[in-house]
Amino acid sequence: MQDIRQETLNECTRAEQSASVVLWEIDLTEVGGERYFFCNEQNEKGEPVTWQGRQYQPYPIQGSGFELNGKGTSTRPTLTVSNLYGMVTGMAEDMQSLVGGTVVRRKVYARFLDAVNFVNGNSYADPEQEVISRWRIEQCSELSAVSASFVLSTPTETDGAVFPGRIMLANTCTWTYRGDECGYSGPAVADEYDQPTSDITKDKCSKCLSGCKFRNNVGNFGGFLSINKLSQ
């Protein structure tokens, strides 16, 4: 369970957000390997992206299917990485196709990256502004001379736990406004700051329980209100 920092939530609602950077940690220590840190891009200095003092080496890597799902079976994302010089082939042969390894996905707004990434530094650098999700490598679905693809599963699927397979937030709804999980399809009510409006172009959800109350839709709130009580 992770609380998303308020500064990151504020960045989500800005009209002009900074770029979202996805950082990947592939931890193969449980299957006899090492930890690898990759990013699909470089910083503005043409160097590896640095986050929390750690460098993430530029390497072709792409994830898909990480959208939140509140219905049916758990999400099964796919991670595709370059098989440059046969690196993945060698590891897959030595470590049972990497099954059982851990994949950590970090999303960070460029606004909060370490100052060392920028020519003129960064006064907004904040190592706590990240959103993390953890996954297990369930199977190697494709392996060629060009790339390798892996199907991921949530740790709860492999350890027998029964928590929902998504980030659990107490006061923030993670559903897409007016999407299937949200279920609201009525007229315009309020903007993202819960200010009343009848303009459909300004109608946005605040992602808070108050937004659901405005729309008489509390039953579909996508947060976990009881989590706050667990630490009391």
Curated annotation (Swiss-Prot):
Residues annotated as transmembrane: none
Cofactor: [4Fe-4S] cluster
Pfam families, per database record: Phage_tail_L
Alphabetic keyword roster: 4Fe-4S, Host cytoplasm, Iron, Iron-sulfur, Late protein, Metal-binding, Viral genome ejection through host cell envelope, Viral long flexible tail ejection system, Viral penetration into host cytoplasm, Viral release from host cell, Viral tail assembly, Viral tail protein, Virion, Virus entry into host cell
Effect after changing C205S: Complete loss of tail assembly
Binding site for [4Fe-4S] cluster: C173, C182, C205, C212
Gene Ontology biological-process entries: symbiont genome ejection through host cell envelope, long flexible tail mechanism; viral tail assembly
Superkingdom of the source species: Viruses
Effect of C182S: Complete loss of tail assembly
GO terms, molecular function: 4 iron, 4 sulfur cluster binding; metal ion binding
One Gene Ontology CC term in the entry: host cell cytoplasm
Cysteine disulfide links: none
Location relative to the cell: Virion; Host cytoplasm
Protein family membership: Belongs to the lambda-like tail tip protein L family.
Comment block on domains: The C-terminus coordinates an iron-sulfur cluster.
NCBIfam families reported in the protein's UniProt record: phage_tail_L
Protein name stated in the entry: Tail tip protein L
